[in-house]
Amino acid sequence: MIPDVSQALSWLEAHPHALKGIRRGIERETLRVTEDGKLATTGHPEKLGAALTHHWITTDFAEALLEFITPVDDNLDHLLTFLRDIHRHVARNLGEERMWPLSMPCFIEAEQDIELAQFGSSNIGRMKTLYREGLKNRYGALMQTISGVHYNFSLPLEFWQAWAGVKDAESGKEQISAGYFRLIRNYYRFGWVIPYLFGASPAICSSFLKGRETALPFERTEQGMCYLPYATSLRLSDLGYTNKSQSNLGITFNDLQSYVEGLKRAIVTPSEEFAKLGVKDGDRHLQLNSNVLQIENELYAPIRPKRVTKSGETPSDALLRGGIEYIEVRSLDINPFSPIGVDAVQARFLDLFLIWCVLADAPEMSSDELLCTRKNWNRVILEGRKPGQTIGIGCDDSREPLAKVGKALFDDLRRVAEVLDSEAGDRQYQQVCDELVAAFDDPELTFSARILKAMKEEGTGRVGLQLAEQYRQMLIEEPLEILTETELAKEQEASWQRQRNVEASDTLSFEEFLKQHGGS
């Protein structure tokens, strides 16, 4: 049902120090909206600095889609407070605009209302916008305004020294990477637990479906909200951002070499479908190229192996150079019950689950098995709270009750929690287990059930507006705790200077620059 990790857990209990110094980072996306919930049509606020070069505040797909990025931190409470400080600062500098507190956008009337993120006149800035133009033409702009939270996680070197016998990160990069790939394979097999507990997009505004075909059996409320009664995360469904042509790429997560080869293959494999869009219309670029992926970042995945890139380096070249440095978890919806879109319970759960994913045995996976793990995810995404819901075990037809598998997993997570708590001298991780395991016996405790109840009563739009206003007031009134106004002003000015420097250092024409960077 789940891998037997009793030996690994016994090892962990004998090596509690191996988990000291886990490092994390959080990225949170949120749409800027007007006081009546419509997508903001203003440019990225100047007071928030230059989106191209600011260390903590940038934009994602759209000019109105803010993204907040924390520095790497080995203290969870400090990390979340830093993220809250960014939110406090932004709330004070948005005028009458608010941050939309849900993953799914609502009051967007027409796709042409969505302006692509702008990054200045430098070649790299223009290329970033052109990449987004390609995404818009390939998948539609509305899909790209869906927001989420990314959780970046790495285990300390001490863990790998004790667990895999490595000496240092440089000589041990193969073993460390193998350990993270094991984590990723287990995440594909069991990560559906994340949308089960924390999925918070069971409903959408009807405007989101306008002109789109869907086979999903939506129910509708009088206000025009569309929902699936047992859904957890429509953001992660095919309604959200998935690339059908990617499922045939055959990218696997068994070792560094084959993963990178698969990724590099995808960025040079022509796509008939995308070629039909054209690459240029006269002088106007429509996409970077017509390959299956314009660049590596276009690969849709619920989890990614990562390494910080050096200047001019692609993500896959960075991985080949130094191995996997950390992993990025991409399956979290915005938490509507938190003013910052994520909370400590979720972060602690992810710590526990990701540690378990490293410890648990994970046989290699073919691309076929990878596709078959998607069935469990889809079942949880679309009807995870259905009474008596079952989960497929492996790729044959055997199934077990979801609640039984979930509770078995939590039996293991509790032992990991005891190790982390014994080091910290408290019970915080065990309390997370107590709180979350109850949701397997009572699905009404899940985020999706709680938010759907409110949405059925008030409508998606009104729930979003009420929370946005409540959080705006709260964040504006709260004092900063870690950052200071002086530091924020300094970073704002420094970011503009960095952007000017980038623009001044360009030597190539945009066309030449594109040719050098995979454009066509």
Curated annotation (Swiss-Prot):
Gene3D superfamilies: 3.30.590.20. Pathway: Sulfur metabolism; glutathione biosynthesis; glutathione from L-cysteine and L-glutamate: step 1/2. Keywords: ATP-binding, Glutathione biosynthesis, Ligase, Nucleotide-binding. GO terms for biological process: glutathione biosynthetic process. Disulfide bonds: none annotated. It holds the Pfam family Glu_cys_ligase. InterPro entries: Gln_synth/guanido_kin_cat_dom, Glu_cys_ligase, Glut_cys_ligase. Its EC number is 6.3.2.2. The keyword ATP-binding applies. GO terms for molecular function: ATP binding; glutamate-cysteine ligase activity; metal ion binding. It is an enzyme of class 6 (ligase). It catalyses: L-cysteine + L-glutamate + ATP = gamma-L-glutamyl-L-cysteine + ADP + phosphate + H(+). The keyword Nucleotidyltransferase does not apply. Signal peptide: none annotated. SUPFAM superfamilies: Glutamine synthetase/guanido kinase. GO terms for cellular component: cytosol. PANTHER family: GLUTAMATE--CYSTEINE LIGASE. Belongs to the glutamate--cysteine ligase type 1 family. Type 1 subfamily. This is Glutamate--cysteine ligase.
